[in-house]
Amino acid sequence: MKSKIKEYLYVLPLALIVSIVPIIVRYKKIELGEVIATYWTRNYNTDFFSYYKMLFFLGLILLTFISFYIYIKKEKELKKTFYYIPLGIYLLMIVLSTIFSEAKLTSLYGFPDRYEGMAVLIGYILIVVFAINLLRSKRQIKFVLTFLLISAVLIGVLGIYQFYGMDFFQTEIGKRLILSAENFEKIAEKLEFRFGDNNIIYATFYNPNYAGSFFAMLFMLTFVMYFFAEGRQNKLLFGAINLLMFANWLGSLSRAGILGVLFSSFILLFLLGRKIIKNWKSLLIIFIGFILVFTAGS
């Protein structure tokens, strides 16, 4: 029992990263430096979807590092893998590009509405290193995936409401959640997130391309989980989640998401094509679901 708890505690920070960070939406007014302001419409940026995601992400990366340090100190085992080489090369390129950048602060912290500077990019690399070493058992993988899917379902439900013109962030409750009391009085009435004339899904990411990329990954992941699920209840559960991710993927109208699914599908067919074809009944059922979802959204 103690060993199980210890396994879960090691990967809890990873579970929090994949579940909490994507769902964060909060208003922040950011004063821009002179260099960035010349490329922006104002000398400040009103951010809802990126700044606090960055802060929570970096905070949880620190927590994951502590977990990783404790694990290495106790287990005295660092997994050996070739993946460290490309990760190291990428890390070197990030550091060099920041050093030689003319806009150092932008390189470090990122650009308005996309705060993915050097610190965050290094955080992405560290996530891979931590995951390689900390995720050692099926229990741990299931634990992290459970957190991810719960978050993805919640984000997916928000997306469906957006598609049908019922954006949660346009309701009073939604606005109060993403605005402080002071800012609610100032900007709540004029707050609006729209993309053209269509109810395009942006979920909790603002940019539909980011949403499309997120749902593309979750769509392909849950598609595989659906096929290899054991038991009718698990099959139905993962099938329903897969259809929800599919609906949001379509509703985001993201070219990046489309390319992601196409590329992933080729890899999936290459690796698991025979197993999927053998399970043709499950394939037929989910494809009927895709058709129904597509028809409902047309």
Feature locations, PLM:
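Membrane-interfacial, low-structure loops and terminal tails that flank and connect transmembrane helices
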Residues: 1-4, 74-80
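Non-cytosolic membrane-interface motifs at loop->transmembrane helix junctions
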Residues: 107-118
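Alpha-helical transmembrane segments of multi-pass inner-membrane proteins
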Residues: 2-25, 56-71, 86-104, 121-130, ...
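Hydrophobic transmembrane helix segments
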Residues: 26-34
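Perimembrane loop-to-helix junctions flanking transmembrane segments
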Residues: 33-48
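Interfacial helix-start motif at the membrane-water boundary
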Residues: 44-60
